């Protein structure tokens, strides 16, 4: 049994929270089920962080019975969802997602992360929590209402920005290997340091992550990617050995190689720098995934040329092909999100290449045509991709990049090429020349599209119709 430490904390609760908590106190006293607020809500209150409107309650008794009684006394009598197999109940009130569970103790079998559950005390319930900062509880009992129950010094760990487990971390992570990902996620989100024995235990138990479903691993990975400094999470994943297991394609970006005095940058660190560079400009998870995958094919395309050194020709094309494979393996969505990332990986060199030459209107038109509505995202990615430490190069790249961006804006306003579709359809071509679907239709359509993109004709119906007639005559077609 752990002797609980308590703190008198002046918590600030909203009007809705205070009303709810006092109602819970009254019902728990009536049922003789001592009740406590636990988990992330407590942690985030102490950190003055916004929380996601979900609050977990533990009672020494039946969580389901307590939830049903409370809901019956609240305005609107919210519907209670019962999960009898887990001894939990859930309902929504005043925009808050509330979950009630009876205090329990847990034990695990090695081949599964699903616990064997028994009724327990508050101390038992706190002992089963993943980290000390998540094992604190706020009492809702009349005798010590609002007191923080903190048996594992979670309050001190919050102040010291330390992440540690309440018990032996090797047992914690072996029992529930997903907690290794959660440790790295919390360290990344909160900018905490993982205590050394806890960090060592992740390395010791890394192979256990293989019993966790891919969906749960990817969910934690996405939360790391959405953090303020996602690179921290990837570095921790790499240092603990988890990265090589859960995302070997990214792990393979690591390292440098020197041949004949010529080396190349570490593509892993470069990619993480690009990812961090994006953070101030976007919370879009899929744009951040595009940053992660933009150079993913460099190991597969790396070659050494004695004259110019290391090359990665075609890595954008190979990388776009790899995107679908990676999304499928990681159980990421394979529809619009995957196609968006695939497109940005394929096009990520194009805007940068335009800054290195006398850019033509034709080249910009083609980029506008291919990028479509994703042009702004592509430009954000390309701007983040400028990671050279040479200040003069950065200045030159940025100036040239701004010039290209302005030219894109000017051409877009003039030619309206975003989501461009030629004004002449295949149906009109077939109708005009009495054709069935076939080679000639494709030739005429391609000819019109190329003429517009090259600036030979404007993007309007009359010019395109005349070009259609001319090309039809050239092909010997009659209308």
Question: Language-model features: where?
Answer:
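Catalytic cores of the polymerase beta-like nucleotidyltransferase superfamily
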Residues: 1-479
């Amino acid at each position: 049994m752990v002797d609980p430490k308590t703190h008198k904390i002046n918590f600030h609760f909203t009007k809705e929270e205070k009303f709810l908590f006092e109602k819970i106190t009254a019902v728990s006293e009536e049922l003789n089920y001592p009740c406590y607020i636990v988990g992330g809500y407590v942690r985030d209150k102490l950190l003055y962080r916004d929380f996601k409107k979900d609050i977990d309650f533990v009672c020494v008794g039946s969580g389901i019975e307590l939830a049903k009684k409370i809901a019956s006394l609240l305005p609107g009598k919210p519907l209670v969802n019962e999960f009898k197999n887990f001894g939990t109940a859930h309902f929504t009130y005043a925009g808050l997602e509330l979950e009630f569970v009876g205090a329990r103790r847990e034990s695990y079998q090695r081949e599964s992360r699903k616990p064997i559950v028994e009724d327990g005390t508050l101390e038992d319930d706190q002992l089963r929590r993943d980290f000390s900062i998540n094992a604190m509880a706020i009492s809702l009992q009349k005798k010590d209402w609002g007191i923080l129950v903190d048996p594992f010094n979670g309050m001190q760990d919050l102040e010291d920005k330390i992440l540690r487990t309440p018990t032996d971390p090797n047992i914690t992570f072996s029992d529930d290997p997903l907690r290794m990902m959660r440790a790295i996620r919390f360290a990344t989100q909160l900018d905490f340091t993982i205590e050394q024995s806890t960090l060592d235990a992740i390395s010791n138990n890394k192979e256990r992550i293989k019993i966790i479903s891919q969906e749960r691993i990817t969910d934690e990975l996405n939360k790391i990617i959405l953090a303020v400094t996602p690179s921290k999470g990837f570095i921790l994943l790499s240092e603990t050995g988890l990265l090589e297991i859960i995302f070997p394609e990214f792990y393979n970006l690591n390292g440098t190689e020197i041949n004949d005095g010529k080396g190349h940058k570490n593509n892993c660190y470069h990619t993480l720098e690009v990812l961090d560079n994006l953070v101030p400009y976007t919370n879009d998870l899929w744009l951040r995934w595009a940053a992660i995958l933009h150079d993913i094919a460099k190991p597969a395309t790396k070659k050494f040329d004695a004259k110019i050194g290391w090359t990665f020709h075609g890595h954008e094309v190979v990388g776009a092909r790899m995107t679908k494979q990676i999304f499928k393996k990681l159980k990421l969505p394979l529809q619009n999100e995957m196609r968006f990332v695939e497109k940005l990986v394929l096009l990520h060199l194009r805007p940068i290449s335009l800054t290195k030459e006398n850019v033509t209107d034709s080249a910009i038109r083609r980029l506008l045509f291919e990028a479509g509505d994703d042009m702004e995202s592509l430009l954000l990615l390309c701007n983040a991709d400028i990671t050279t430490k040479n200040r003069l190069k950065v200045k030159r790249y940025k100036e040239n990049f701004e010039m290209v961006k302005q030219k894109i804006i000017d051409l877009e306003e003039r030619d309206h090429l975003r989501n461009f579709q030629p004004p002449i359809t295949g149906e009109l071509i077939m109708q005009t020349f009495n054709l069935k679907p076939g080679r000639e239709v494709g030739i005429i359509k391609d000819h019109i599209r190329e003429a517009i993109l090259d600036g030979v004709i404007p993007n309007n119906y009359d010019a395109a119709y005349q070009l259609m007639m001319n090309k039809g005559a050239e092909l010997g077609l009659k209308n």
